Amino acid sequence: MNIITQLKDVMDTHGYSQGQVARAIGRSVTAMNQYVQGKYNGDIADMEERIANFIRRVREKQNALRIDERFVSTPTARKGLEVLAYAHQECEICVLYGAAGLGKTMTLKEYARRDDAVIFIEADPGYTARTLLEELCGRLKQNKNGNIHTLIDLCVEKLKGTGRLLIIDEAELLPYRALEVIRRLHDKAGIGVVMAGMPRLITNLKGKRGEFAQLYSRVALALDMGNALDREDFDQIAVDLMPEAEDQKIRNALYDQSKGNARRLFKLARGVYR
């Protein structure tokens, strides 16, 4: 099968246009079209090498075993779910915090998947109090116009008595004023709230000198998920991802390479199966 036939087969199978292939190999659409028609007058060897590399990459990606990050019900994850359930049932403010890559977000999303009464918001670095309220208004299908006090009142009116749970991920990115808005929503609407993020979230809630006592006093439970996975958690996730990890030596190697970090473990597992 010549290179043009192979290329057409890949394009038909995966739905690639000539334009997409041209961009992927760093050549113009015109040059790509001319080559396919057998009219290309440029460096044919270079063109065919680029196309061959493109075909190889597509096939490698197709043949690779796809390993997606997914929730695994480890002891720590179950503790996280218990904290979420407590915040939801008792309408309290709770916090999950720990280093990056330990599964906080997956635990939050798993709880949200199980219960459609959850409002899940992932904060971004540019979030302000107003941005947070506008995002919440959007989820509640409320008008986003008005000042912050108006938006708070709209959200409170919509949330009061609903028994919903507001989850804020990456909450360490929120400024103090946004954290105060969350406190007011909790106080006035009587809903449960869970904030999750890096360890500095606790500092942000307390204040560097403890000046935010009124804010942190609302926190009923704060679960420290640590700086690395417990070995029991790690081994369970490793075996769930890779049957080969039943071997203790393989688990030890994975643990050493990933430093007990779930996110690094997922990346290692993907690399193993490529």
Descriptions of predicted regions:
Residues D224-I250:
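Conserved small helical "lid"/interfacial subdomain of P-loop NTPases
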Residues V156-A178, I182-K188, G192-V193:
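Conserved P-loop NTPase "ATPase switch" module shared by AAA+ and STAND
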Residues I121-P125, N204-R209, A220-E232:
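Conserved AAA+ ATPase "SRH/arginine-finger" region at the nucleotide-binding site
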